[in-house]
Amino acid sequence: MRHQDVAIIIPSRLSSTRLKQKPLQLIGSITLIERVFKQVNQAGLEHTYVATDSEEIASVITKVGGKVIFTDSAIPTGTDRTYEAFKLIPNNQNINYIVNVQGDMPFIEPSSILKIIEYLKNSKYDIVTPIVKVDRESVKASSNVTVVVDSAGTALYFSRSLIPNGAEEFLYHVGMYGFRKNALEKFVSLKPTFLEKTERLEQLRALENGMTIGTCLVENVPISVDTEEDLKKAVKFYENISKLGL
């Protein structure tokens, strides 16, 4: 298998404030977390894991041949859960890059995962994350995050507000991160910062501490499921692609 020095970790906890037992919600006849895992698994990497605190989630994943790492339910963030899971991977000294894929994107494209891995390996960035060019209507929801970058594609700032102000086209941030191992270790050692807590965006902790985040363009905005309304959209999308035989 390719990229033997890369681990993909999908953090997934059962408790959710906005959508009860979110990972186990059905899209068609398949749970959200199973759909995420199956999409990610198409990237073809050996070291692909779901990190969870739930026996129910673990059961779903192991039944389809996936690998699970149990992490403490008290872990505060997805990135912290990713790091805790990484430390429990057998022979992890051979892993130099870790990709954190959020467990709420049931139609994430495997090509996007491979793209950030290649970009991370061929750059000097601490972290790499995907972005999509979108218009104003596509990002008006408060759960969406936009980013501004410099001429080289280095992230300058992320926000839940539309930035830059007054623009008609924006860069939508896709919730997936590729870390160098030492960058992930540094990130989790840092305390939450003012901007991170204000915007409720973990990646600002990295920027406030001088870490570099590179961005790479991908084509499609993946559906993220955070609310009941998001779930309805995901089900509708699934029904539409099923009719087309995709």
Curated annotation (Swiss-Prot):
Catalytic reactions of this protein: 3-deoxy-alpha-D-manno-oct-2-ulosonate + CTP = CMP-3-deoxy-beta-D-manno-octulosonate + diphosphate
One Pfam family in the UniProt entry: CTP_transf_3
Subcellular location per the Swiss-Prot or TrEMBL entry: Cytoplasm
CDD domains: CMP-KDO-Synthetase (cd02517)
InterPro entries: Cytidylyl_trans, KdsB, Nucleotide-diphossugar_trans
Pathway: Nucleotide-sugar biosynthesis; CMP-3-deoxy-D-manno-octulosonate biosynthesis; CMP-3-deoxy-D-manno-octulosonate from 3-deoxy-D-manno-octulosonate and CTP: step 1/1; Bacterial outer membrane biogenesis; lipopolysaccharide biosynthesis
E.C. no: 2.7.7.38
Keywords associated with the record: Cytoplasm, Lipopolysaccharide biosynthesis, Nucleotidyltransferase, Transferase
GO terms, molecular function: 3-deoxy-manno-octulosonate cytidylyltransferase activity
Gene Ontology CC: one annotated term: cytosol
GO biological process terms, semicolon-separated: CMP-keto-3-deoxy-D-manno-octulosonic acid biosynthetic process; lipopolysaccharide biosynthetic process
Gene3D superfamilies the UniProt entry points to: Spore Coat Polysaccharide Biosynthesis Protein SpsA, Chain A
Family stated for the protein in its record: Belongs to the KdsB family.
Task performed by this protein: Activates KDO (a required 8-carbon sugar) for incorporation into bacterial lipopolysaccharide in Gram-negative bacteria.
Protein name: 3-deoxy-manno-octulosonate cytidylyltransferase
